Amino acid sequence: MTNIRKTHPLLKILNSSLVDLPAPSSLTSWWNFGSLLGICLAVQILTGLFLAMHYTSDTATAFNSVTHICRDVNYGWILRYLHANGASMFFICLYLHVGRSLYYGSYTYTETWNIGIILLFAVMATAFMGYVLPWGQMSFWGATVITNLLSAIPYIGTDLVQWIWGGFSVDKATLTRFFAFHFLLPFIISALVMVHLLFLHETGSNNPTGIPSDLDMIPFHPYYTIKDILGLLIMLTALSTLVLFSPDLLGDPDNYTPANPLNTPPHIKPEWYFLFAYAILRSIPNKLGGVLALVLSILVLAIVPMLHTSKQQSMMFRPLSQCLFWLLVADLLMLTWIGGQPVEHPYVIIGQVASILYFSIILVFMPLTGIMENHLLKW
């Protein structure tokens, strides 16, 4: 008798993508992050759903409702901190996932890669709107500063900002719509994830060598299911340690002060996972230029496949490109550090140099290095 998982209309879809999926035999732990991101998304949707049951999106009560969740709701504190720190875990996994794809040349699967970039933008938008909801000082001023950037768009900028605000400043209308979109976007992200996987399974997974692995495939289950569970346990250990021992480690103390439009915090800065982009934004003295650089810091990933000059897909056997890749990682860490510092000497100039280096590595040095390596290999 044929197994039900291979014949049932719904189960056979799951079977072909989670059980009998042929996968390259050489996948390392760097390929774990896709499943970890899926689990992060599920955790965020579940904790968010339960938080939404107790949260009120009104400027008068939003801050108090979050306090009420932490103090009076059964296990509300753990829900709130799982959701807040789960976002940090989400971004750690996201950045490692993107880094893996850059290193091993997975961006040559352009459809999967482009959907991934859209997903990255969607997750960033969701996280930004979520940060506004507790209605603390940093929530209010973060929302004011970031939405105000749209006023740099010629002609329609000011009208656009007021349209997004629903008035002449960040107020009740803004908070309500941010809550609505923050609730909606994760479900759109879930749909995009399905499309991401659909395109991935059209081509099959890349592998560390970058060489086609059609001759050497193994079933996804049990080999990679077990491997993914190990990654999951490590991530859950890290997340629960963070939540239970220092839940506010990655947060901003200013957000424990209720929003006050009359009092600006000394240093307005976003959550740590946006600091690299924030540093690039601040490095350019012109407002419109800064906004463009901010968007391009992520959008530049879309042209990476066009800039692939090497005849090898992966960086596994390309030491010069590897050096550049790790220089890029160090540069991003430096930008993250700069984004959290005040706008004063020497941080400004360090940020400007790091921003120029970031775009130079991706747009100039990596393609040139690929050409040079081809020449060195006499190809």
Swiss-Prot record:
Binds 2 heme b groups non-covalently. GO terms for cellular component: mitochondrial inner membrane; respiratory chain complex III. CDD domains: cytochrome_b_C (cd00290), Cytochrome_b_N (cd00284). PROSITE patterns: CYTB_CTER (PS51003), CYTB_NTER (PS51002). Pfam families: Cytochrom_B_C, Cytochrome_B. The chain crosses the membrane at residues 33-53, 77-98, 113-133, 178-198, 226-246, 288-308, 320-340, 347-367. GO terms for biological process: mitochondrial electron transport, ubiquinol to cytochrome c. GO terms for molecular function: metal ion binding; ubiquinol-cytochrome-c reductase activity. Heme b b566 binds at residues 97, 196. Keywords: Electron transport, Heme, Iron, Membrane, Metal-binding, Mitochondrion, Mitochondrion inner membrane, Respiratory chain, Transmembrane, Transmembrane helix, Transport, Ubiquinone. It is a multi-pass membrane protein. Heme b b562 binds at residues 83, 182. It is found in: Mitochondrion inner membrane. Its cofactor is heme b. A ubiquinone binds at residue 201. The keyword Heme applies. SUPFAM superfamilies: a domain/subunit of cytochrome bc1 complex (Ubiquinol-cytochrome c reductase), Transmembrane di-heme cytochromes. Component of the ubiquinol-cytochrome c reductase complex (complex III or cytochrome b-c1 complex) that is part of the mitochondrial respiratory chain. The b-c1 complex mediates electron transfer from ubiquinol to cytochrome c. Contributes to the generation of a proton gradient across the mitochondrial membrane that is then used for ATP synthesis. The cytochrome bc1 complex contains 11 subunits: 3 respiratory subunits (MT-CYB, CYC1 and UQCRFS1), 2 core proteins (UQCRC1 and UQCRC2) and 6 low-molecular weight proteins (UQCRH/QCR6, UQCRB/QCR7, UQCRQ/QCR8, UQCR10/QCR9, UQCR11/QCR10 and a cleavage product of UQCRFS1). This cytochrome bc1 complex then forms a dimer. Belongs to the cytochrome b family. Heme 1 (or BL or b562) is low-potential and absorbs at about 562 nm, and heme 2 (or BH or b566) is high-potential and absorbs at about 566 nm. This is Cytochrome b. It comes from Micronycteris schmidtorum (Schmidts's big-eared bat).
